[in-house]
Amino acid sequence: MNFNEELKQRVEQINALLAEKLPAEEGMQQRVAEAMNYSVNAGGKRLRPMLLLEVYRLLGGNDEKIMEPFMAALECIHTYSLVHDDLPAMDNDDYRRGKLTTHKKFGEDFGVL
């Protein structure tokens, strides 16, 4: 397998992991879950979770399932930093990765959340 194929496969695995860990868009928190899912699923290279897993392996880890919550959390924290960077009080960006920023689609209050 070449590098690009490996990278694509890992991104797909991380996207599946995030879909499993993120909340369902239903119930009383539906709008919050929609904003969270929109933000996290806006794209990206998913390098941070990949690097975390590789460091774990480098240090002798062999049970990848143990790392899944940490990988998902790391990607969510990174996404949070991007959402906050886009807010009007910071860069006031309207688009990220070709899509409306979270605060433009859901309102500034959801961008802060």
Regions found by a protein language model. Name each.
Residues 4-7:
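Double-stranded RNA-binding/processing signature
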Residues 12-113:
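Mg2+-dependent prenyl diphosphate-binding active-site environment of isoprenoid biosynthetic enzymes
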